[in-house]
Amino acid sequence: MIIAVDGMGGDFAPELVVEGCIQAVKEYEGIHIIITGKKELIKNELDKREYKGNKIEILNAEEVISTNEAPVKAIRRKKDSSMVKALELVKEGKAQAVISAGSTGALMAGATFVLGRIKGINRVCLAPLLPGAKAPFMIADAGANVDCKAEYLVQFAMMGKVYFESVLGVKSPTVGLVNIGAEEEKGNELTKAAYKLLKDTDFNFIGNIEPRDIPRGEVNIAVCDGFIGNTVLKTYEGVASNLFSMLKKEIMASTRGKIGGALLKPVFKDFKKKFDYTEYGGSPFLGAKGICIKAHGSSDAKAFKNAIRQAKICYDKKIIEEIENNLGNLIENNI
């Protein structure tokens, strides 16, 4: 399997991108990586780490898409950018997956306009995995589509279901519709229409779910439009980050707290690991005609290595074909 990696995307590119790629080719069999970006910079990083293998190559790209550029314009105008070059490798069949920690908006535009959508899929959705009290959960969509139709949400649910079953090995994952209340009649026109459609599918649909219940692990796939999803995601990340800061501050405020903190250090370490985004790799753009993984902007080497593992599993489990097959079932049932 060949994986295209945007070597210039993210806060720590190209250093930690290269480090993650080296770790991946050493750990995972059957992968070859093409790093796109400024050849001299990437080669220097490989040389610094004394990499002498033949599983990593460089494709030169002189331009870089920054996070403050208009996404669609950047994708269309910067043809020699590391992100576009990586996407084009997948489009041309020269790679089977693309990974980038660069601009989310630009990668979304690239997944849509360079890779294209799977036939019959209305919108590509961003579907991050997050740690929950019982097990990881997915938000679909987490920001790619601010305005949605009810049928889009059904497709998001289907693609999330495929990901859980194929990639994570979870049979019959639960699907919940994010809403302001659990009752069927709650919500706006979109959620009411989506509820009716989801109820008619063969998904393990548990009904409406309030945002507060998502981290409790009450649902595997939380379905919503991108505006709601991104708000839930950012709130969750903010609360998790501040919780650790507040806890540390309270522990260090007294001698008793310091002693208790020292005794509980292994517990805190395990607890913090559960909230470590690097464990999950990245967020897949589901619905694109190619495997496309968005790594976190602040990804370290471990996160890149795990994103590469994630891409490999998606490829091995034939996730694109599985989405196509499941989409056919929806169409047959007029949903």
Swiss-Prot record:
GO terms for biological process: fatty acid biosynthetic process; phospholipid biosynthetic process. Its EC number is 2.3.1.274. One of its GO terms (molecular function) is phosphate:acyl-[acyl carrier protein] acyltransferase activity. It catalyses: a fatty acyl-[ACP] + phosphate = an acyl phosphate + holo-[ACP]. Keywords: Cytoplasm, Lipid biosynthesis, Lipid metabolism, Phospholipid biosynthesis, Phospholipid metabolism, Transferase. Pathway: Lipid metabolism; phospholipid metabolism. It is found in: Cytoplasm. It holds the Pfam family FA_synthesis. One of its GO terms (cellular component) is cytoplasm. The keyword Transferase applies. The keyword Hydrolase does not apply. Homodimer. Probably interacts with PlsY. Catalyzes the reversible formation of acyl-phosphate (acyl-PO(4)) from acyl-[acyl-carrier-protein] (acyl-ACP). This enzyme utilizes acyl-ACP as fatty acyl donor, but not acyl-CoA. Belongs to the PlsX family. This is Phosphate acyltransferase. The gene is plsX.
